[in-house]
Amino acid sequence: FSLKPEYGHKPEYGLKPEYAIKPEPSVKNAEISVLEAELQSMRKLLESMNRQMEKLDGEQGVWPVPLQKWADLLRERGISPQLIKRLLRTVQQEVREEDWPDEERVRASIRGSIRQICSKTAAIQPGVLKPRVVALIGPTGVGKTTTIGKLAAGFSIVDKRRVALITADTYRVAAVDQLKTFGEIIGVPVEVVMTPSSLKEAIARHQDKELIFIDTAGRSPHHELHMSELRAFLEKAQPDLTMLVMSAATQAADLAKIYERFANLTTHLVFTKMDETVCGGTILSLLDRTELPVAYITNGQNVPDDIEVATPERLTRYILGEED
């Protein structure tokens, strides 16, 4: 049994179109709202996925296009991947995404972060009632003797201070001769000592000076006997400042090892040969991990010109290659 077709119902075909129940407009609007909400939810999900992908890319050394050029530049300057990540994460926090193509804004953010890492600086101050005793230590070949010559010339000739030089570097005759020559040229007394006790006596003879610089033999950080000898000299000298001299042209991993071996003897840092590397950023990882201040940087062989008091701005410029 079935209704006749004229009554509008065929079980096998359903209602005729003219008899079909049409949805109310409010129902259509509700369906559209649901679809729009679903699209908005999908859009947010995609944005979140993009952010996660960008984060993963940053960890793997790949960044959004406007920041990738900065990642490449920082890498070329010898800055570690970990620090690059930190610097660019700070950019993402401080600079709106639409401003990332603005080189000045991005550079300002990066410079600000690097300046903060380089904020610990302190130069030598001459003694007042007694001489300030300054010892320079470090591995071989980093330019300790030349650095002492620059410091002595600067303080004696430019600042008119009373200065004495003492060398305990008896391993290298050339170093002794070099320091004696410096002394003769700038009119500063130079003493050569062979033992820790004679070093103490030499310091006592120059109590009328404002500054006494001590040149020590270059020591291999891996040679325990050499390190023991250095400690013996420093124990007798009791310097007010002990400056660890390191070459900025040294690879970051080697800088870290040198620092670890000398750190317990050190009060200040000096970086030499800043002019001999295009990877000035190698020192940044070390500065990030130490509380020791940087006193001086050197950028050539000329005495006394090629030495500068370290400042956060000056270090930042060298690290970013802005001194070239």
Residue map of PLM features:
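Generic beta-sheet signal
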Residues: R132-V134, V163, E210-I214, T242
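Generic detector of well-ordered alpha-helical packing
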Residues: A168-T170, T216, K273
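Post-nucleotide-binding-loop coupling segment downstream of the phosphate-binding loop, primarily
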Residues: T170, A175-V176
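Primarily NTPase-proximal linker/entry elements flanking Walker-type ATP/GTP-binding cores
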Residues: K22-V163, T167-T170, T181-F182, I186-P196
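Conserved catalytic-core segment of NTP-binding enzymes
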Residues: Q178, I185, M194-R205, L211, ...
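Glycine-rich beta-strand-to-loop/alpha-helix junction loops that act as flexible
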Residues: I137-G138, D215-A217
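Asparagine/serine/threonine-enriched low-complexity, disordered tracts
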Residues: F1-K10, K16-K28
